[in-house]
Amino acid sequence: MDRLIEYFGHHMTLASAAIVMAGVVAVYEFRNRAQSEAALAPQDVVRLMNQGALVIDLRTQEAFAGGHLNGARQMTGEQILKAAETLKKYKEKPLVVYDDNGSAGVSASRQLAAQGFTKAFNLRGGLAAWRAENLPLTKG
């Protein structure tokens, strides 16, 4: 142990870099696990949509009009928080949220889960992942 302390004393830059890298890896892994708990691949979202899931688009009205998942409703993250009473009838149904890249969807699905929505999910990768799979969009 004494030799390890001596080594770090002589190689402070190397030791600091190792500690920073360990922290970066820990944060990355933590975020990955947190996102994957309630994140679904596009094919899984299609399956839930076929079972009658409620789909919520978190993007702007303009982006929504440019193309969205079939049957999706447009709501902002703030509207979801305020609309908990309106969405209450969907608490037991699958509910999928998405945005352009999946980042806002993670937060929204967590907020919904905290409000008692037991089947709230995020589209992993957002609309970008949906498009990458060449899945259809509805315009208007």
Question: What residues fall within each predicted segment?
Answer:
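Structural scaffold elements adjacent to functional motifs in cytosolic proteins
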Residues: V55-D57
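Rhodanese-like catalytic fold shared by cysteine-dependent sulfurtransferases
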Residues: M1-A39, L48-Q51, Q61, A65-P94, ...
